[in-house]
UniProtKB/Swiss-Prot annotation:
It comes from Mus musculus (Mouse). The keyword Transit peptide applies. Keywords: Electron transport, Membrane, Mitochondrion, Mitochondrion inner membrane, Phosphoprotein, Respiratory chain, Transit peptide, Transport. Belongs to the complex I NDUFV3 subunit family. The modification Phosphoserine is found at S101. Coiled coil: none annotated. One of its GO terms (biological process) is aerobic respiration. This is NADH dehydrogenase [ubiquinone] flavoprotein 3, mitochondrial. Residues 1-35 form a transit peptide. Residues 38-68 are annotated as: Disordered. It is found in: Mitochondrion inner membrane. The lineage of its organism: Eukaryota, Metazoa, Chordata, Craniata, Vertebrata.
Amino acid sequence: MAVSLLLRGGRIRALKAVLLEARVFPGELVSVVRLSTESEKSAKEKELHPKTQSVLKEPEPTDTTTYKNLQHHDYNTYTFLDLNLDLSKFRLPQPSSGRESPRH
């Protein structure tokens, strides 16, 4: 049904028809009403407990300009080659199909 309405050029009508069929509007209205009542309750609670707001701690300032874990990144020119040499003894031989590999 929505496709036929879109083909007629009435995109707004088609969207409205799809949303009405899916019953989106009534659900959204209920959620808006729920949110408004919750915000009223929280405002009343804030008036009753003004001390809890002043007790909240401020977040600690963080220094993101330096990396703290320096031993984790200890690279030099031969790091990859050293690791490659150390791990080469644990590598398994590659399976062979019996044919020679193509030369490019």
